[in-house]
């Protein structure tokens, strides 16, 4: 069986895996980083390739998922604010180093491909993945094909505005973007926004700077009034964004991944009726909303799958 190296470049860590054509992760490495440089990526990939070769695995290609705007035809990172990279020739650098095919794409698109091929989206033709973490990443599959857009920018679902007049300021500079309202960061901001109504709340008593979306969610599950109010507003905004996605794409399935998805049924059961109420132009209940099946492995599995398929872009694309 052919294998590929799948690499997921995160803001504070790199995950590298050897993945087979069946989508099974055979070896996996996690590397915590303070500042990601090209040399670090090269050394991590080299170590992973050596592991595979020590076990007589046939490494056919390398796939990289990176945050930012990626030229999927050349493998260049056009712009990645996470790493302060601009027009960085990541694909070319790795191809010269290892003399095997290397393919680079946006990390959320890679995760979408992984979930579509081997996770929640398997067996569907129209599928959307949303990753709720610090921000909101995403990817769209339409009629069985990953939607890339004219310049590889399709799927930036996190930056459509759901509260343009009364929302939080997004990192992109706009007001009320989906990710500003319904990401893990958005949940924290909701907690601070409703805090004046809960002057005796214990949620912010200790180290407010360390408040996390996980802490808020757990407190909401335990019935804390402050956390419940923040969670209610967060779920309302999540429902708005999901209803918009259904109107835009009309997928069979929306999978929710990322750190916030660990809320599981507590999140899904709360958001589904609101989405149904907001869905007007397509038949209600025709889109299922589920927690993504592959979890943190989706990016690596998708990157490796992309590499084994020969990339995301065909040779005739201009």
Region roles according to the model:
Residues 108-112:
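Active-site-adjacent loop/helix segments that line or gate small-molecule/cofactor pockets in enzymes
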Residues 122-181:
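Glycine-rich phosphate-binding loop of actin/hexokinase-like ATP-binding domains
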Residues 104-106:
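Short loop/edge segments at beta-strand edges and connector loops
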Residues 24-25, 77, 146-147:
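Hydrophobic "anchor" residues
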Residues 75-86:
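A charged helix-plus-loop insertion that forms the helical arch/lid used to bind
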Residues 1-61, 71-74, 91-102, 117-124, ...:
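ATP-binding/phosphotransfer module of carbohydrate and carboxylate kinases, centering on a glycine-rich
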Residues 28-31, 81, 150:
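Short hydrophobic alpha-helix segments
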């Amino acid at each position: 069986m052919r294998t590929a190296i799948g690499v997921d470049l995160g803001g504070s860590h790199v995950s590298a895996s050897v993945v087979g054509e069946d989508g099974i992760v055979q070896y996996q490495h996690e590397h915590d980083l303070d500042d990601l440089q090209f040399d670090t990526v090269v050394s991590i990939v080299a170590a992973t390739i050596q592991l595979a070769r020590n076990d007589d695995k046939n490494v056919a290609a390398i796939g990289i998922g990176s945050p930012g705007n990626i030229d999927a035809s050349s493998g260049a990172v056009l712009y990645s604010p996470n790493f302060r990279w601009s027009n960085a020739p990541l694909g070319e650098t790795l191809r010269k180093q290892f003399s095997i095919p290397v393919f680079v794409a946006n990390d959320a698109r890679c995760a979408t491909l992984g979930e579509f091929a081997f996770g929640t989206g398997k067996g569907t033709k129209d599928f959307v993945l949303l990753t709720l973490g610090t921000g909101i990443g995403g990817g769209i599959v339409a009629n069985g094909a990953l939607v890339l857009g004219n310049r590889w920018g399709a799927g930036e679902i996190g930056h459509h505005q759901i509260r343009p007049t009364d929302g939080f300021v997004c990192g992109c500079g706009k007001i009320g973007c989906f990710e500003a309202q319904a990401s893990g960061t958005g949940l924290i901001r909701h907690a601070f926004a409703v805090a004046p109504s809960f002057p005796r709340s214990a949620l912010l008593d200790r180290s407010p700077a360390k408040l996390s979306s996980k802490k808020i969610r757990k407190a909401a599950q335990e019935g804390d009034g402050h956390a419940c109010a923040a969670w209610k507003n967060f779920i309302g905004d999540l429902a708005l964004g999901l209803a918009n996605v259904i109107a835009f794409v009309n997928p069979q399935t929306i999978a929710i991944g990322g750190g916030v998805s660990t809320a599981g049924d507590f999140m899904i059961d709360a958001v589904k009726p609101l989405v149904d109420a907001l869905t007007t132009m397509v038949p209600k209940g025709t889109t299922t909303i589920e927690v993504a099946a592959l979890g943190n492995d989706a990016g690596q599995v998708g990157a490796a799958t992309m590499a084994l398929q020969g990339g995301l872009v065909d040779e005739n694309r201009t």
